[in-house]
């Protein structure tokens, strides 16, 4: 009001939005809803966080553990697309900016979500277990040649151990399921190698 009274123009304010939890409420340290940057960096790469922040900078963002896998998969998809794009399209790809014009050229062989599923189904507590599964389907893939994937295995284990394993529930089989499982074990033992 004062600026208008003296005939001057209002200064441009700094536009920013808050971070929201999964319910769309403001993140609060006292409530513990949402995740911190340090937690994100335990579960995913700094580049995935940069990409998450880069997209829609003026819009409020939900920042909770459930967005991490999707953000990582979005990042991996953009890296994969980058190699196939024309030069002018590459400049429009956010990973060009996230990596200061030099995105990695590593072949993306599986999503972070798939690694989380592998970690969950195998109860993996180290990356060697995950690499055994990866190598079943991609024999030519080696950790030292696939830095992104190797880092993702560590992130997947951290995320699984902290966020998924505590919520994991095991169903006790009923009588019919016990019979079926017992029959399956017998059949598997009888298969000749």
Task: List each language-model region with its residue ranges.
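Secondary-structure transition/capping motifs at alpha-helix termini
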Residues: 4-11
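Glycine-centered secondary-structure boundary/capping sites
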Residues: 7, 138, 161-163, 169, ...
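Catalytic adenosine-cofactor/nucleotide-binding cores of aminoacyl-tRNA synthetases and other
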Residues: 16-163
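Long, compositionally biased, intrinsically disordered segments
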Residues: 133-137, 167-174
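C-terminal non-catalytic accessory extensions
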Residues: 160, 164-165, 189-193
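C-terminal accessory/binding modules appended to enzymatic or scaffolding proteins
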Residues: 172-193
